[in-house]
Amino acid sequence: MVLHSKVAIIGAGAVGASTAYALMFKNICTEIIIVDINPDIVQAQVLDLADAASVSNTPIRAGSAEEAGQSDIIVITAGAKQKEGEPRTKLIERNYRVLKNIIGGMQPIRSDAIILVVVNPVDILTHIAQTLSGLAPNQVIGSGTYLDTTRLRVHLGDIFDVNPQSIHAFVLGEHGDSQMIAWEAASIGGQPLTSFPEFAELDKKAISKAISGKAMEIIRLKGATFYGIGACAADLVHTIMLNRKSVHPVSVYVEKYGVTFSMPAKLGWRGVEKIYEVPLTEEEEALLLKSVEALKAVEYLS
């Protein structure tokens, strides 16, 4: 357990509860508090998680928005879900209002707090959260394409018969329709992925579609995704809290492009400590610029 490691999770839904559950068993938090506008949901989740906490050393309880604002790390999972046939702009409008209320309720937010946004559209909402909170851009991070990258590495691990943790490959850009895979920079054991005989046989478009479409397939079959993103959010908290200096693809403000989207970033106590520029082919750079254009076209980023 790390001294001064209080984590607040805003949102007691499936993603918030999954994040709390995954984080509990890392035994790095002095305390986890859960905050939600629905007191019954908070009580139910805390009671249920407290049973699991009996085999963990992490206290968990309900908390207030004001307490959340004084936590070391604030994980925002509360947000409206996209309705069937609803335009993306309408979802942004609804989640903007939710985010504005959340951040307003937490004020004053600790000047050294780290905010992790785990709500879609995550790139846009991370940008908005940074603006509303008044914190420095390096202190406000979105989950971005971390889960997409994990899915890609698992998929490639199956193809190349190697542990996914030994694969260095990234999904970059917007977490959404315009995200892209940096194939040229991908490697296994220091050897470029493009140099493997199997690479020539890869259907890269099919892989990209499978990675970006996996969430919708899960939603179609059971209504929502939460375990995977909860585990990823907990891992990001772990990385920051232990100052691990690990590199993950997360939503960050990238000055070169003038937008918030996913690039590999070194994470530690101060949040984002360094953003790494991935070598891309001309075709890949063009795809990344499509992400930039898609995000800049959104009214709330203007």
From Swiss-Prot:
EC class name: oxidoreductase
Keywords attached to this entry: Cytoplasm, NAD, Oxidoreductase
Annotated GO MF terms: L-lactate dehydrogenase activity
Recorded superkingdom: Eukaryota
Segments crossing the lipid bilayer: none
Pathway(s) annotated for this protein in UniProt: Fermentation; pyruvate fermentation to lactate; (S)-lactate from pyruvate: step 1/1
Active site (record annotation): 175
GO annotation (BP), single: lactate metabolic process
UniProt main location, coarse: cytoplasm
Binding-site list for NAD(+): 120
Catalysed reactions, semicolon-separated: (S)-lactate + NAD(+) = pyruvate + NADH + H(+)
A cellular-component GO term for this protein: cytoplasm
Function description: Converts L-lactate to pyruvate.
The family this protein is said to belong to: Belongs to the LDH/MDH superfamily. LDH family.
Stated name of the protein: L-lactate dehydrogenase B
Top-level taxonomy: Eukaryota, Fungi, Fungi incertae sedis, Mucoromycota, Mucoromycotina
Gene that this sequence comes from: LDHB
